[in-house]
Amino acid sequence: MAHKKAGGSSRNGRDSKGKRLGIKAFGGERVIPGNIIARQRGTTWHPGLNVGMGTDHTLFAKIEGVVEFHARANRTFISVRPVAAQAAE
């Protein structure tokens, strides 16, 4: 009598969801206080002027202004440059 042994179950088939990391506000974009500029694991980008860093390394704007990227000594910094107030006409 021919018998077929029971098939074992696969131990694969799992994967985690994407975490939606990356730049959320690119260079030249206007931001307001609290806007998230970048989500990251570790410090791929470092906070520059007027940028804060959360406990999960999220970078966020502290003031209203324009996002700027600049590299210095093997690090990329993200800053927010304030926009000059427009003169009343």
From Swiss-Prot:
Top-level taxon of the source organism: Bacteria
InterPro entries recorded: Ribosomal_bL27, Ribosomal_bL27_CS
GO cellular component: cytosolic large ribosomal subunit
Protein name (record): Large ribosomal subunit protein bL27
Keywords: Ribonucleoprotein, Ribosomal protein
Biological-process GO terms, alphabetical: translation
Organism from which the protein derives: Bradyrhizobium sp. (strain BTAi1 / ATCC BAA-1182)
Molecular-function GO terms, alphabetical: structural constituent of ribosome
UniProt region (Disordered), positions on chain: 1-21
Family of the protein in this entry: Belongs to the bacterial ribosomal protein bL27 family.
